[in-house]
Amino acid sequence: ITLILLITCTFTLTGCRNQTTDSGFKENVEIAWDDVKDDFDQIDQDVENDTSKQDVKALTQTILDGYDKIKEGITQDNQEEAKKVYEAASRLEYIEKNTDQKLSSEEKEILELGKKTKTLMMYYYGNGEGVFQDAVDDVENGIDRVKNFTEEKWNDFKDKLE
């Protein structure tokens, strides 16, 4: 009986990380949210305590550069890149929540990329809610918006946030 319970528990614990979820995320979760939660909570806390002005263009570029490296899931090999992407996303989200400037719909979408990226990353850590493909679409649409932002628009946006 002990052996059966041990086998059942082992199968259940290892099997959970490899199942397709109802959300549609089909990749293996190599690094669970519980394994990184404290680090990411610290990133969020550091962002809130940092009063320096952030370069929104540089933050979005960090997400663009890192997204291709993490979009298939987060592994030991790309975990550091994932932290950079998460920090940039957290900073964008913080700016979005704390700006009192009147922003255009395009500028709001740029800042919303932070929250959308963090939402998508929850799936990669096995903690996503909702439909996975919707989260992917939200991030990829946000990335397209960033790619189509002109230098003039970036300069205007930067001026508003200073």
Segments predicted by a language model, with ranges:
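Sec-dependent bacterial lipoprotein signal peptides
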Residues: 1-15
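Serine/threonine-rich, low-complexity intrinsically disordered segments
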Residues: 12-14, 65, 152
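Immediate post-signal-peptide N-terminus of mature secreted/exported proteins
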Residues: 16-83
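Low-complexity, polar/amphipathic intrinsically disordered segments that mediate membrane, lipid-surface
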Residues: 17-25, 88, 156, 160
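C-terminal amphipathic alpha-helix
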Residues: 36, 40-51, 105-162
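Extended low-polarity, hydrophobic cluster-rich segments
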Residues: 59-66, 85-92, 110-127
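Polar/charged low-complexity regions in secreted precursors and cytosolic/nuclear IDRs
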Residues: 64, 68, 72, 94-95, ...
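Short, solvent-exposed, charged loop/turn and helix-capping segments
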Residues: 74-111
